[in-house]
Swiss-Prot record:
Native species: Flavobacterium johnsoniae (strain ATCC 17061 / DSM 2064 / JCM 8514 / BCRC 14874 / CCUG 350202 / NBRC 14942 / NCIMB 11054 / UW101)
PANTHER family xrefs: 50S RIBOSOMAL PROTEIN L4 (PTHR10746), LARGE RIBOSOMAL SUBUNIT PROTEIN UL4M (PTHR10746:SF6)
Protein name (Swiss-Prot/TrEMBL): Large ribosomal subunit protein uL4
Gene Ontology terms: biological process: translation
Subunit structure: Part of the 50S ribosomal subunit.
InterPro entries (alphabetical): Ribosomal_uL4, Ribosomal_uL4-like, Ribosomal_uL4_dom_sf
């Protein structure tokens, strides 16, 4: 598929780029997307939740009443899970939620995400640009020129650009990443995907392996 290239003033440069059909025009595999997003979110979890079990609760181990003759259920300790302040039965324990996915499935998921965005016409190809120094106002002007002000957008760079990154860091609705940092979750969690020309070759090279 062909997409026109815009400059950072939002004007047509008169050039077009050919996006690879094997990356931007496949039939999306929803299950692969689901697994990759699930893995990404699972990896964000700290897994430090912890509840005290019966053996870990502070309290006396003295038997609180005699075994028989009270007419009520037997009870051995105030740490019994049935009592207020007692231990928790099968409570959460520290654990890792991360799990592995093979590379082919992750590539398929990213290609599916790109294809979904392309089908929705939510991909913009932008000429590579740079700022002389970090300047949020300059980045806002780029957003205005592209009609993306106050809209959720993700800018994908070919390589790290400190000035562009710092210029966008204070904007809640816009994020800047490099092609190597791009995830399925990030692609789908934005309304508009802005691909700088320098990132296209790297994306297609990485996902065509």
């Amino acid at each position: 598929m062909e997409v026109k290239v815009l400059d950072f003033n939002g004007k047509d440069t008169g050039r077009k780029v050919q996006l690879s059909d094997s990356v931007f025009a496949i039939e999306p595999n929803n299950h692969a997307v689901y697994l990759d997003v699930k893995q990404y979110l699972a990896n964000q979890r700290q897994g430090t939740h912890k509840a005290k079990e019966r053996a870990e609760v502070t309290g006396s181990t003295r038997k609180i009443k005699k075994q028989k003759g009270t007419g009520t259920a037997r009870a051995g300790s105030v740490k019994n899970p049935l009592f207020k302040g007692g231990g928790t039965v099968f409570g959460p324990r520290p654990r890792s939620y991360s799990f592995k996915l093979n590379k082919n499935l992750k590539r398929l998921a990213r290609k599916s995400a790109f294809s979904i965005k392309a089908k929705e016409s939510n991909i913009i190809v932008l000429e590579d640009f740079n700022f002389e120094a970090p300047n949020t106002k300059n980045f806002i002007n780029v957003l205005k020129a592209l009609g993306l002000e106050n809209k959720k957008s993700l800018f994908v760079l070919g390589e790290s650009n400190k000035n562009v990154y710092l210029s966008s860091r204070n904007l809640k609705a816009s994020n800047v990443v490099t092609s190597s940092e791009l995830s399925t979750y990030a692609i789908l969690n934005t309304n508009n995907l802005v691909l700088l020309e320098g990132s296209l070759e790297l994306i297609e090279e990485n996902l065509s392996k």
